[in-house]
Structure formats: structure tokens, C-alpha cells
């Protein structure tokens, strides 16, 4: 980390006296030439501003604090603006005998009024006058504003009388807040004092509760706009939850109710403990530093800590790689821990406000707290009571007397469907050191926690409260190690702990039947699961191996064993939980990267799973894990693949122990296909040839309606020159389904993939079938560049896509450059190591090739063309994506119809695919000029 620098004196950066002397000299040298006079003044002020900003930037990069930097920038801006004011009122529009009405005062308001300024923030100014606007004041204001714009400032300004300020402050809380922070820069001092007095007496007096209510609502609305979770992996430093604006809100409320000018002064209110006061100052400083670095790095008022900026800000703030922890992830973990602290401070502040105002203003506070004045209601648990619909405690001593109460508190809150009172929450955060190794092994504490986890009414909400308070990570240290941990990739939308708790919440929703429309299979098998406790424990601990030694899955299994043994879980359950954690990615890997219609695939999966109970547990965990990754990650296509794999594996287990798994799958496929063939022929006797030509696996992959339409499409293809295609967007689907029937040939799949990408389509899934007569039927699941179903808003675009596929199917596809999507700019932040694996054991009759690299339009075409150029035919393709990374698996055969067994050909194929992936990586656009990429995390 850079060493801390001592604060510097403002006059060592911008000498106000010397600046004014230079401006006066320039004015005297250019008397009679207003244009030259103005130009020279602007040039002098620009130099001062540039010097001030560069010194602030250099000091920040060498260890100056965030708050010191923001105050220095504010001070530099003060000197420039006040010097401009003096120049304007002395040399340009001098009032030699100013009247009472020509008095003018210039005040900084809003964030600038606080005296803390980010490098490229807007500045808000108030020109205060005693009466109506005079020609002199109007001239001064206009001249100054144009000059400030020429200096590069973005200025928010108002010209008002004191009367107008008071009236508007009563009507508008935004104006009221800006006046609250008003700070005189220059001009008539009496006007500023009069405004301050009238604002305090006529606006602030007896309106504390009203102001608090408005600010809290404003905070809630802002967080809803910016993203309600403080654990979004591209946070808004200013407006996001846990960001600077949350601290500003506390300061506004504090200053409105008490005279507070600096963050350090909050301590004088005795709102926070000494530890909490230090946390407040630490958070305030850290967030100011991050924001200043963001502005200096981008050269503009950038407030979002986007992926492309995170590595550079980490470097500037002194973070380096440490072991397996990259610098960017260490920095972002620090950011999220600070955001978490801000949430804790907000609750502590709320508790203090509530206690103080029920004592001093019993009628006022009720306007913004739920209901009327809270009523105390005794509970049948000693030390706890209900306080206005929230759970509270008799005092801190109940934790000191029995630290297990720190766990019981949350269990009682869950059982009785109560939120925590801010007093109780604050008491918990102050009692965290009481959670020792003895408490972690206490049978009562362990039983209370396990009951809450597996049988809680609202597990996500209660566990989130425990996590926010610091109890969850303290009681389960394995979980504590991933609190606030982010993974530097585009796949995950949340930190590891937030993702985990959301996944636990999804299981709770599945168990309650709330997700039956989205996950009918998971909901239907939930009552059959024998060990719910193992299910919830595995979900809670499934990602605790991230950042561990020996790989995510094995490290996670070790963590799970450690946690379960300490919780007193029986041995057989410990091993089950550890197995689930170690294998929690297996089902999604098999479903999304392998051919689930291949008996060998299902047999291999069944050998890993071993029994129906594990299969049920793994399905629910897989669904919850994928769904909790972030918006848009789960889709119906993934659900369909998981259902197919589950049903096929369940059929294996129904065949009994000792039976041949692959043979069981084959028998299941044969019976399914026989029934589907009969049903299709009954509906469409003309499909007899098509039915006879297709393999069994095809019939278990689609509904009867789909089979009927495919048969019609195949007939159309024969009539209209060898290819026919059609597309549709099914209700509730997040991808368009485009089906093409065409005569199979080498390179067909590559041509089809190129046609899709050339129209801006992104293939998120594909199924490839070939009849015994050489007729191909390929089904593509396609999104547009925004991630929406292709053509969902424009049916003509979907028709154009079908036409393009028909043309490609006939062999006359246009060689067009694939369109670049907007996501490519975000993905440019990551350095992605390509990889290729070739497996000749995964299938009985095909070689499985898996290629992983940077996702981009046209990648699927490039890989498929490489396979075609190697004289290989694609039997099936499985497209998967993890944010910036694509993982495409192909089942391929030689021209003779078998596996690729020649070692030299396998090595050449791997080299060619790696070359295609590496060329793709090398040609990827830069995120921003001058920014370096950081290695993308491969953790899932």
C-alpha cells in the first residue's frame, strides 16, 4: 500500500494572493480590450486549476487519503472561483457605489458545499441577493457562468433572494438539503448569515421527523434505481447501496438534528461507539479515494466501478496479487466489506435516532416509522420482547450472560416472522467477539442454527440479516472466508456470500412451492428428499472452497466436512454434504456440455451419483445454484437439459443395482421413441419415412407438437431445394428457437453458425440430429446482443434469420463479418486463457472436443469451421457460456463414422482449435486506451 502523506497547506498548491495579483496585472495590461482581458484571465485560472488537480492526483497516487484529496480539490476550486469573482466585480463590472440592492453573496451548495469534491464533479453555486435581480448582479452572474464553463466546470446554479430560498426549501427537500450544506465562498457576509439564521428558524425548526422521513425514502428510491444489493459486482460508488450517498444521508440527518460539519463530528453526538466512529471515518475516506481514482483514471465523472476499471483502480490503490488472490479481487473484497460496514452504521444510526426522538419528539418520529409509537410486547423467551413488530432485547447483557443468544435471536425472529429492531442489530454487531470456538461447538447454538437453516420460514431474509450483522461468518468461519468475495468475471452478478444466500433462498422457495411454474420437476421431487438438512447445509457451504487450495470443489468439500463436524452433524450426513459440495457442478456440466441423449453420458453420470436420493439433491442444488448467479442466467433451455438428464438417470436407477446403466438408458430411449413414433404416425401418416430415418435419441428430446412440425419442415425442405427453416419465440422463453432441415454435408453447421452471427444473433444452445438418409435437423436457441430472444420485438428479423439459414443450408451463405455485440466492450476487461480438451472415453461412438475461450460473435462458426477443415462431422454441439467465456463442446466423427483415434490427428486438431481461440483473444478490442486486462476468474 502507498504510504500515507501528511495533509498539505492549500497555499502551497494554489496561492490565492498571487493568483489575484496575476489576474489584476492581466486586467491592467488589457484595459480597453475586453476580449483579451477575459482570455488572459481564463488562461491564468486554467493554469491554477490544472496545477491544483495534478498535485491532488499525484498526492493521491502517493498515499494521500481520499478525504484529504477531495478537500484539497474543493479548496483549489474555492480559490479559482473566488479569484474569478473578485476579478469580475473589481475589473469587469465594478460597482463603485453599491446600493443595498446590489449586494451579492456567492455560496457553494450541495456536495461542493460540504467542502469535499471529486475531480470532475459538478459544482453547485447559489448567488444570493437581498432583493430582486439588478442589472449589475445579472451581469456579474452571466460573466462568471460563461467563464466557469470555459474553465471546463459543469455548473449547477441558482440566483435567489433569502425569501425565495426559505420558501423553496419548505416545498422541496432537495433544495432544503442543498441549503443545509451551503457554505459562503465570497461576497456579502451578512447575506449568508441572514440566510443561515432564517433557514434554521423557519425551515429546520420542529421539522426533524419530516426531513428524516424524506431522506430515508429518497435513499430507498435511489437504491432501487442503482441496484438494491450492496453486493452487485459493478457497484456505483456514489449512488449504490453502501456507497457514499448512504454516508451523506447520515450526515444530512445528523446535521439537520445536530450541528455536524465533518464526519469526525458524528462522534460528538454519541451515536456510535469509538469502533463504529472509526469505521465511519474509514469508510468515508476509502469511498472518497475510490471515487477520486475513478474520475482521474477516466477523465470524467465516472461513478461505476466497472470491470474494465477495477484492475486499474486496484493498482492505483496499492493492491497486489497475494498467493492465489488476484489484486483486483482483493481490492473488490475490501470495497464490499466497506459497503457492508456502511449498512451496519446505518442501522446503528437509525437505532439512535429512534431512541432519541421517541424520548424528545414522540409525535414527530411516528410520521416516518411504521405505525404509531411502538408498543412493547412480552415474549415467552427470557431477555427478548416484541417492539413495534420488531424483535428487541432487554440489553447487551443477555449476550454477555449467554452468547448462544446471538444465534437464538435470529431463530426467534424467523419463527415469529419479525424483523430485528435497530437496537438489537447494533447490540449484535458490538457483541461479535463473544462468538468464540466454544460457542461454535455449543450443542444449543448448533441446533438452533441448523433448525433455522433447514426449517426456517424465510431463510434468505434471516440469513441475510445474520450475514449483515457479521454473525453468520463468525459462527461459520468457512462461510466467513467468502464474505464480500467477488470473482473477477462477467458470469456472477453478486459476491460469493450474496450468491450463496440467494441460492439458499431459491431452495426455500422451491420447498414452499412458489417456483412451480419455473421449476416443476424440482418442486415435485422436493417432498421425496429424505434429508433436507443436508440439502441446505450443502447449499450454504457449496462455494466455501473458492480461493482455497487444491481446486474449488475439493477445497469446498474439506470446508464442508470441517463445518459439519463442528456443528455436530452425524458422520453419514457429513459425508453426504461433502459429496454434494464436491460435485455441485457435475450435473450442470453433464447437462450443458455433454449429449444427454447419449447412453454413455447418462451411464457415466449415474456412476458418479450412485442413488436416487443424491440425484434429487443434486438437481435441486443445481437449479438453485444457476438461478442465483444473476438475472438472465437461468433459462428454459437449461431446465430442459437438466430434466432430460434427470429422467434418463432416474430410469437407470429404476433398472436396479448391478444392471448395465447404458443398457437401461437405451431401453428407456427405445420405449420413449416407440411411443413418440406411434403418436406421430397417428397424427401424420405421411411422416412414416421421416420417423423411420431418425434415431431414438431424437424422439425423447422434443414434444409431440415439435416432432409434428419437424416432419413438416423436412418435407418442405425436400420440395424447395434442399433446405427449410422457421423460427419462433415461445412464451416465457429467453431465446428464440430456430429450426432448419437441410441435406447434411461437411461444414453445414459452421455455415449455419456464420449466418446467425452475421445477423447479430448469439447462439446459446444447439441440438444437432442427422437421419439415416443424411438429412440434418438442427435446432438453434438464439438471443440478440441485449440477451433477449432474437426477434422478440421484431418478427421480421426472425423471418430474415430463417431465410439466412435456408440460404446457408443450400450452400450459398454470404461471407459476412459477424456483428460485434455491446457485451464485447465489457468483456474486453478480461484476459482469458483459451483451452481445448479432447475426450475419447465420454462417448461410445464419437470423440468429444471441448473448446473454451473468449465469447464473441462468430466464435462458434470459427470452431465449427476448424472441425470441418479437419474432415470431421459434428454429431452434436453443446454451447455454454459463463459471462465473458464460452465453452463449446462438439461430438465429432471421422468421414468413416467413428472416433478420432490417430494421435497425430488429435494433436493437430487441438493445435488448430487453440490457434483459432488465441487469434480470437489477440484480436479482442481493448477496454479503454491505457488500461490493462486482468486475468478472468474461472471459478463458477
From Swiss-Prot:
InterPro entries in the record: ACT-like_dom_sf, ACT_dom, HD/PDEase_dom, HD_domain, NT_sf, PII_UdlTrfase/GS_AdlTrfase, UTase/UR
EC number of this enzyme: 2.7.7.59, 3.1.4.-
Domain ACT: 737-821, 848-929
Magnesium among keywords: yes
GO biological process terms, semicolon-separated: regulation of nitrogen utilization
Domain of life assignment: Bacteria
Any one GO molecular-function label of the UniProt entry: [protein-PII] uridylyltransferase activity
Cofactor: Mg(2+)
Domain HD: 496-618
Control of this protein's activity: Uridylyltransferase (UTase) activity is inhibited by glutamine, while glutamine activates uridylyl-removing (UR) activity.
The keyword Hydrolase is assigned to this record: yes
Signal sequence bounds: none
Region feature Uridylyl-removing, mapped onto this chain: 380-736
Any Pfam family the entry gives: HD
Physiological role: Modifies, by uridylylation and deuridylylation, the PII regulatory proteins (GlnB and homologs), in response to the nitrogen status of the cell that GlnD senses through the glutamine level. Under low glutamine levels, catalyzes the conversion of the PII proteins and UTP to PII-UMP and PPi, while under higher glutamine levels, GlnD hydrolyzes PII-UMP to PII and UMP (deuridylylation). Thus, controls uridylylation state and activity of the PII proteins, and plays an important role in the regulation of nitrogen assimilation and metabolism.
Family: Belongs to the GlnD family.
HAMAP family: PII_uridylyl_transf
PANTHER family to which the protein is assigned, alphabetical: BIFUNCTIONAL URIDYLYLTRANSFERASE/URIDYLYL-REMOVING ENZYME, BIFUNCTIONAL URIDYLYLTRANSFERASE_URIDYLYL-REMOVING ENZYME
Name of the protein this chain belongs to: Bifunctional uridylyltransferase/uridylyl-removing enzyme
Organism, scientific name: Caulobacter vibrioides (strain NA1000 / CB15N) (Caulobacter crescentus)
Amino acid at each position: 500500500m502507498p504510504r500515507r502523506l501528511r495533509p498539505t497547506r492549500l497555499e502551497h498548491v494554489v496561492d490565492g494572493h498571487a493568483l489575484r495579483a496575476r489576474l489584476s496585472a492581466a486586467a491592467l495590461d488589457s484595459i480597453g480590450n475586453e476580449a483579451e482581458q477575459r482570455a488572459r484571465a481564463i488562461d491564468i485560472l486554467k493554469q491554477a486549476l490544472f496545477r491544483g488537480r495534478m498535485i491532488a492526483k499525484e498526492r493521491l497516487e502517493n498515499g494521500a487519503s481520499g478525504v484529504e484529496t477531495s478537500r484539497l480539490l474543493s479548496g483549489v476550486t474555492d480559490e479559482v472561483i473566488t479569484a474569478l469573482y473578485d476579478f469580475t466585480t473589481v475589473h469587469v463590472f465594478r460597482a463603485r457605489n453599491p446600493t443595498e440592492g446590489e449586494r451579492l453573496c456567492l455560496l457553494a451548495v450541495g456536495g461542493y458545499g460540504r467542502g469535499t469534491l471529486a475531480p470532475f464533479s459538478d459544482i453547485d453555486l447559489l448567488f444570493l441577493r437581498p432583493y430582486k435581480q439588478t442589472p449589475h448582479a445579472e451581469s456579474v452572474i452571466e460573466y462568471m457562468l460563461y467563464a466557469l464553463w470555459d474553465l471546463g466546470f459543469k455548473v449547477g446554479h441558482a440566483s435567489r433572494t433569502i425569501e425565495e430560498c426559505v420558501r423553496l426549501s419548505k416545498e422541496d427537500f432537495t433544495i432544503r438539503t442543498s441549503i443545509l450544506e451551503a457554505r459562503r465562498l465570497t461576497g456579502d457576509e451578512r447575506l449568508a448569515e441572514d440566510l443561515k439564521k432564517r433557514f434554521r428558524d423557519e425551515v429546520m425548526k420542529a421539522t426533524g421527523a419530516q426531513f428524516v422521513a424524506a431522506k430515508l425514502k429518497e435513499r430507498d428510491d435511489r437504491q432501487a434505481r442503482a441496484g438494491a444489493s450492496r453486493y452487485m459486482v459493478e457497484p456505483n460508488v456514489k449512488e449504490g447501496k453502501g456507497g457514499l450517498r448512504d454516508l451523506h444521508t447520515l450526515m444530512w440527518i445528523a446535521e439537520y438534528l445536530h450541528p455536524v460539519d465533518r464526519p469526525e463530528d458524528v462522534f460528538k453526538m454519541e451515536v456510535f461507539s469509538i469502533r463504529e466512529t472509526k469505521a465511519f471515518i474509514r469508510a468515508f475516506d476509502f469511498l472518497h479515494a475510490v471515487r477520486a481514482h475513478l474520475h482521474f483514471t477516466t477523465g470524467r465523472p465516472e461513478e461505476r466501478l466497472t470491470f474494465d476499471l477495477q484492475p486499474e483502480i486496484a493498482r492505483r490503490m496499492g493492491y497486489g496479487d497475494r498467493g492465489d488472490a488476484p489484486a483486483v479481487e482483493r481490492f473488490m473484497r475490501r470495497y464490499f466489506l466497506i459497503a457492508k460496514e456502511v449498512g451496519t452504521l446505518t442501522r446503528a444510526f437509525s437505532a439512535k435516532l429512534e431512541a432519541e426522538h421517541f424520548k424528545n419528539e414522540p409525535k414527530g418520529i411516528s410520521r416516518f416509522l411504521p405505525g404509531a409509537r411502538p408498543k412493547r410486547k412480552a415474549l415467552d423467551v427470557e431477555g427478548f420482547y416484541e417492539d413495534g413488530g420488531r424483535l428487541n432485547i432487554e440489553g447487551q447483557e443477555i449476550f454477555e450472560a449467554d452468547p448462544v443468544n446471538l444465534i437464538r435471536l435470529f431463530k426467534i425472529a424467523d419463527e415469529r416472522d419479525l424483523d430485528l429492531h435497530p437496537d438489537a442489530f447494533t447490540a449484535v454487531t458490538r457483541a461479535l467477539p463473544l462468538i468464540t470456538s466454544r460457542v461454535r461447538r455449543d450443542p444449543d447454538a448448533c441446533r438452533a442454527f441448523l433448525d433455522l437453516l433447514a426449517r426456517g420460514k424465510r431463510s434468505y431474509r434471516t440469513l441475510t440479516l445474520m450475514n449483515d450483522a457479521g454473525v453468520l461468518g463468525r459462527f461459520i468461519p468457512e462461510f466467513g472466508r467468502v464474505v464480500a468475495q467477488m470473482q473477477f468475471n462477467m458470469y456472477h452478478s453478486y459476491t460469493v456470500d450474496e450468491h450463496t444466500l440467494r441460492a439458499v433462498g431459491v431452495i426455500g422457495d422451491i420447498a414452499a412451492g412458489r417456483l412451480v411454474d419455473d421449476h416443476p420437476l424440482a418442486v415435485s421431487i422436493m417432498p421425496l428428499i429424505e434429508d433436507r438438512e443436508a440439502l441446505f447445509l450443502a447449499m450454504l457451504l457449496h462455494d466455501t472452497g473458492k480461493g482455497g487450495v487444491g481446486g474449488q470443489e475439493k477445497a469446498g468439500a474439506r470446508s464442508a466436512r470441517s463445518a459439519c463436524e463442528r456443528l455436530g452433524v452425524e458422520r453419514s450426513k457429513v459425508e453426504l454434504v461433502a459429496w454434494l459440495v464436491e460435485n455441485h457442478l457435475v450435473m450442470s456440466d453433464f447437462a450443458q456440455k455433454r449429449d444427454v441423449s447419449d447412453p454413455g453420458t447418462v451411464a457415466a453420470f449415474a456412476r458418479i451419483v450412485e442413488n436416487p436420493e443424491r440425484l434429487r439433491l443434486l438437481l435441486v442444488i443445481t437449479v438453485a445454484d444457476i438461478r442465483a448467479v444473476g438475472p438472465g442466467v437461468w433459462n428454459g433451455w437449461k431446465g430442459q437439459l437438466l430434466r432430460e438428464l434427470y429422467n434418463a438417470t432416474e430410469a437407470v436407477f429404476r433398472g436396479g443395482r448391478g444392471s448395465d446403466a447404458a443398457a437401461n438408458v437405451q431401453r428407456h430411449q427405445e420405449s420413449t421413441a416407440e411411443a413418440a413414433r406411434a403418436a406421430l404416425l397417428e397424427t401424420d401418416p405421411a411422416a412414416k419415412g421421416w420417423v423411420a430415418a431418425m434415431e431414438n435419441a431424437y424422439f425423447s428430446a422434443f414434444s409431440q407438437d415439435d416432432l409434428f412440425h419437424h416432419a413438416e419442415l423436412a418435407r418442405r425442405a425436400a420440395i424447395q431445394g434442399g433446405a427449410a427453416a422457421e423460427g419462433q419465440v415461445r412464451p416465457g422463453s429467453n431465446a428464440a428457437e430456430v429450426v432448419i432441415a437441410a441435406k447434411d454435408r461437411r461444414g453445414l453447421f459452421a455455415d449455419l453458425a456464420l449466418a446467425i452471427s452475421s445477423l447479430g444473433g448469439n447462439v446459446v444452445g444447439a441440438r444437432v440430429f442427422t437421419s439415416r438418409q443424411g438429412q440434418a435437423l438442427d435446432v438453434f436457441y438464439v438471443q440478440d446482443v441485449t440477451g433477449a430472444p432474437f426477434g422478440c420485438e421484431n418478427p421480421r428479423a426472425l423471418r430474415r434469420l430463417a431465410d439466412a439459414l435456408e440460404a446457408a443450408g443450400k450452400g450459398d451463405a454470404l461471407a459476412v463479418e459477424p456483428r460485434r455485440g455491446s457485451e464485447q466492450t465489457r468483456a474486453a476487461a478480461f484476459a482469458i486463457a483459451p483451452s481445448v480438451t479432447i475426450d475419447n472415453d465420454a462417448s461410445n461412438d464419437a470423440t468429444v472436443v471441448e473448446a473454451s475461450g473468449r465469447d464473441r460473435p462468430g466464435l462458434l462458426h470459427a470452431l465449427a469451421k476448424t472441425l470441418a477443415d479437419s474432415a470431421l462431422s459434428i454429431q452434436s454441439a453443446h454451447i455454454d457460456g459463463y459471462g465473458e467465456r464460452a465453452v463449446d463442446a462438439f461430438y465429432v466423427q471421422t468421414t468413416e463414422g467413428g472416433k478420432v483415434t490417430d494421435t497425430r490427428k488429435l494433436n493437430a486438431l487441438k493445435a488448430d482449435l487453440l490457434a483459432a481461440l488465441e487469434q480470437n483473444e489477440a484480436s479482442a478490442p481493448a477496454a479503454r486506451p491505457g488500461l490493462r486486462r486482468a486475468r478472468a476468474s474461472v471459478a463458477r
